[in-house]
Regions:
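DPxDG-like acidic metal-binding loop motif
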Residues: 91-102, 106-129
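N-terminal subdomain of lithium-sensitive/metallo-dependent phosphomonoesterases centered on the IMPase/IPPase/PAP
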Residues: 4-97
């Protein structure tokens, strides 16, 4: 993890390569963590594996992250819930939208189409979308 995700820049669009690579690695590792569960007809276990991986890796980043779109409300999801704070609490503040495993049924049935997703923006720039 670099000293700064921006170097001398303050705009998210100017994020450095190290920061970009960290985000790519987070989604890759979340996707790979699902591999042992492919085709086992248990979408809950597959989703838990991806969520655990993504949360663990987000918490290693030098950011103050706020999940604005996640796995559900705090009382419905144990991790990556809306409002959860992630990162080391050092560095710039971000809003984060995640879906560690989009297409849980595809993964459970070993079908193509499941993906791991993360979107990140400067604080207060992502629409906070609690599920209704």
């Amino acid at each position: 993890i670099g000293k700064s995700v921006f170097g001398a820049r303050k705009n998210l669009m100017d994020i450095d390569k190290v920061f970009q690579d960290q985000l790519i690695k987070i989604t890759q590792e979340a996707a790979v963590s699902v591999y042992p569960h492919l085709g086992k007809n248990n979408k809950v276990i597959a989703d838990e594996a991806a969520t655990n991986s993504m949360r663990t890796n987000l918490n290693k980043m030098n950011i103050k992250g706020n999940i604005v779109i996640g796995e559900g409300e705090m009382d419905e999801a144990p991790m990556l819930y809306i409002g959860e704070k992630v990162g080391t609490k050092k560095g710039p503040e971000f809003d984060i939208a995640v879906d560690p495993l989009e297409g849980t049924n595809f993964a459970a049935k070993n079908l193509p189409g499941a993906i791991s997703v993360i979107a990140i923006s400067n604080k207060n720039n992502l629409f906070n979308a609690p599920e209704s």
